[in-house]
Amino acid sequence: MEYKYSTIVDSSKWDPEGLIEGIPLRKHEAGDLEEVGSFRVQEDWRRLVGPVENPFRGSLGPEISFITYTVPECLPERLEAISYGLDYGFLHDDEIDTKIEEAELDDVGAALAQGGSTGKIQEGTKSSGKRKMAAQLLREMMALDPERAMTLAKSWAQGVQHSARRVEEKDWKSLDEYIPFRCMDLGYMHWHGLVTFGCAITVPEEEEEERRTLLEPAVIACLMTNDLFSYEKEKNDNNPQNAVAVIMKIHKCSEEEARDICKQRIRLECRKYARIVKETLARTDISLDLKRYIEIMQYTVSGNWAWSTQCPRYHADAKFNELQMLRAEHGVAKYPARYSLENRKNGANGVNGVNGINGVNGVNGVNGKRKRSGEETADDARTNGNGIKKPAHVLEYRDSLVLEDIVALSLDWNLPDLSDGVVVQPYKYLTSLPSKGFRDQAIDSLNTWLRVPTKTTKMIKDVIKMLHSASLMLDDIEDNSPLRRGKPSTHVIYGNAQTINSATYQYTEATGLAARLPNPTSLRIYLEEVQQLYIGQSYDLYWTHNALCPSIPEYLKMVDQKTGGLFRMLTRLMVSESPARSSILDQTLYPLSHLIGRFFQIRDDYQNLASAEYARQKGYAEDLDEGKYSFTLIHCINTLEAEASLASEKMALRAFLIKRRVDSSLSNESKREVLDIMKKTKSLEYTLGVLRALQAELEKEVDSLEAKFGEENFSLRMMLELLKV
């Protein structure tokens, strides 16, 4: 990776014991911007929330400040914003530690979830100061990089959700039991969002699990470091959530011995991660952004250690430096940033900048490596130039036309197998596109109650992902849709035939995976629901092809079988694989899955016509191009049929629908005319009213289920909050 904004620093002063040996320490050239962000959030907190120590003992240190050393390759124009976000997190975290009942976790979590869903946080005259601060920060970040700003908001919301569990005291039986909880409590999801935003990184969704696995030693090293240095101020708590305390209790040892054990674990995890970084950078089967992410996160480990050795947050006797004290006393308005963004090219439009490209294999050859014109790389001899391996036998036999060679080939039953590299390419392309991951969230939310083992949960997620992705590939062909998530649809790139082949291959893969689920009943459930998916889709296609408007009941039943089918399938599979399945009635979760399916589809219908963001992702009022009978269009047609005064609008709409059938699309001018007719019938308003009513019913259903299971489901409520219109 090219280093543009940082320089190597000798770490021996901060690490005389060599605990982080093998992981370099770097310093950002624009560290002054971190201080500005930190003092700005302190000033805002005092003004909008309440008193706070001055200077606040957060991310700053007299020699080493946190962001400057942990994100040394942050784009300079984003450094102040992520510094603000980090110390906002520290301020909120301290409030949770001292008075959790006043921390407004629900409000902050809901605000961030809303920001992650819509790109903005609604404010009102009665909004809390914390909500106003979060809204302002999100606005600043959206102006720089909307997609990654929303990703940050979602990640942060997940961290706030976890913080709510601190109300419950934990009695840890082992360090291995403590570590997973502490990994989340560390603010890892918040930090993940800040780093990916700051460095303009987007790890493809299909690499998320691998990202978490590769990163695990780094996260453990950081949590052990934090616990090692924070124990002094936490040791007098009734039940400190700290690795040193856990080790002392488990091993019945002294504090000094526990600290030594903690250090040895840090050394071990650092060595693991240094090896992972080296191995990851040598790989050719993962995206460039995952490589960058794993490399960049090593500086979180080294920077966190160096910062922890001298920061006032962990050391009561540590003093801030002179400039920090001046800014604390007089404000950043009087002592502004000394670093000038204008005097430095920021490189934001580079390979992975704000407008960068993060394709599966990059844009200029295998894994994004650029080749000089006419130059052949070592891999070119083994690939077709697009990262797909040539079959081995092509290299061995070449293209011989000698009769004996042809006969020998014809009689050879042991020719090397053809890999699945070609058939999965369209699928890999689709799954590399940005996704909100609602179905994974639904599975995780249900697991709050169902307690399905992690391995089985992952299998169910993969089954649903394969089916959903395959259905999108086929839907786009059937609907002749040119865009998917703001990018060209799969068939536009790979052609209809190859896309259909890839999609049906994924159906067979999903079936094979469903057959390997522990409970044999799961395969039957899977097959039943796949049949329903096809039946539901058949009616959608039938109505479109024949220009037949269904009734509302027919439409809802189609939705139950098509869109709701995947939600129902994942619900039934999770119940089938739950250890508590014997005590759960078959119908317990059916109303929830049906409501989510109907809400999701009607919401999609509404946004297709009313959302500017949806238009950017899929095209302007795309459902009208496809000739689909959406909920809104059905209401419009029914209203026109019932209102004699709208006879001319009825004729006009019918003419537009016939024109769409003949031309296979409508012009934007025609679409605007159709939308004007819908405004006269108030169909969009009606659809929005139905959505809000369904949202209320969903909330009631969650209340009912929480009562039945005896456990609140914050993650499910968060998911529903993200879906609000």
UniProtKB/Swiss-Prot annotation:
Domain commentary: The conserved DDXXD motifs as well as the NSE/DTE motif are important for the catalytic activity, presumably through binding to Mg(2+).
Catalysed reactions, as listed in the record: isopentenyl diphosphate + (2E,6E)-farnesyl diphosphate = (2E,6E,10E)-geranylgeranyl diphosphate + diphosphate; isopentenyl diphosphate + (2E,6E,10E)-geranylgeranyl diphosphate = (2E,6E,10E,14E)-geranylfarnesyl diphosphate + diphosphate; (2E,6E,10E,14E)-geranylfarnesyl diphosphate + H2O = ophiobolin F + diphosphate
Gene3D superfamilies, sorted: Farnesyl Diphosphate Synthase
Single Gene Ontology BP annotation: terpenoid biosynthetic process
Region ((7Z)-ophiobola-7,19-dien-3-ol synthase): 1-322
Domain of life of the source: Eukaryota
Residues annotated as binding Mg(2+) 2: 93, 97
Organism: Aspergillus calidoustus
Span list, region Disordered: 362-388
One Pfam family matching this protein: polyprenyl_synt
Designated name of the protein: Ophiobolin F synthase
UniProt motif (NSE/DTE) ranges: 226-234
PANTHER family: GERANYLGERANYL PYROPHOSPHATE SYNTHASE, THIJ_PFPI FAMILY PROTEIN (AFU_ORTHOLOGUE AFUA_3G01210)-RELATED
Residues annotated for Mg(2+) 4 binding in this entry: 475, 479
Biased composition, class Basic and acidic residues, residue ranges: 373-382
